């Protein structure tokens, strides 16, 4: 279960704090207003924790696909690769997403994020979610992208 779904399930079914087992481990979910908040845990930047197939600098991977290059990689309970681009809508995520998701560099496959920094408080994001395809919302993708943006300065 993804963390978005875990938080919604707890909010809708229980309305009380809970701990939920996900593929990324046990997470704490707290009711919050009409929804719930999730403790995402610490992001992991080590190549073997993401995981990648071999050691490399996860702040700027020395790889590229069709005009997308030097992405960052981070695990927030699941693996993400993040590309900063000028226009997220110009990236053919429907075609390049599955190619990157299934690249041998990512032994557990990977979520593919393309992001544009709007200003210091806003990022526009599109996500190709591993195993699900293009998605309209991805909480771990938003967290991974924000962490990588802060990491890049």
Feature-to-residue mapping (PLM):
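Helical hairpin unit composed of two closely spaced alpha helices linked by a short loop
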Residues: 140-142
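Active-site proximal loop and beta-alpha junction motif in alpha/beta enzyme cores
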Residues: 1-137, 147-153
């Amino acid at each position: 279960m993804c963390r978005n779904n875990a938080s919604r399930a707890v909010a809708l079914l229980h309305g009380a704090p809970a701990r939920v087992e996900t593929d990324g481990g046990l997470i704490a979910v707290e009711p919050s207003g009409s929804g719930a908040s999730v403790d995402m845990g610490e992001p992991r930047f080590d190549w073997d924790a993401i995981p990648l197939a071999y050691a490399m600098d996860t702040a700027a991977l020395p790889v590229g696909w069709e005009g997308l290059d030097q992405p960052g990689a981070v695990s927030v309970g699941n693996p993400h690769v993040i590309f900063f681009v000028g226009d997220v809508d110009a990236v053919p995520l429907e075609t390049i997403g599955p190619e990157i998701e299934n690249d041998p560099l990512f032994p557990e496959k990977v979520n593919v994020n393309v992001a544009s920094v709007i200003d210091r408080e806003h990022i526009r994001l599109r996500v190709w979610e591993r195993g699900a395809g293009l998605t309209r919302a991805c909480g771990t993708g938003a967290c991974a992208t924000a962490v990588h943006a802060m990491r890049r300065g």
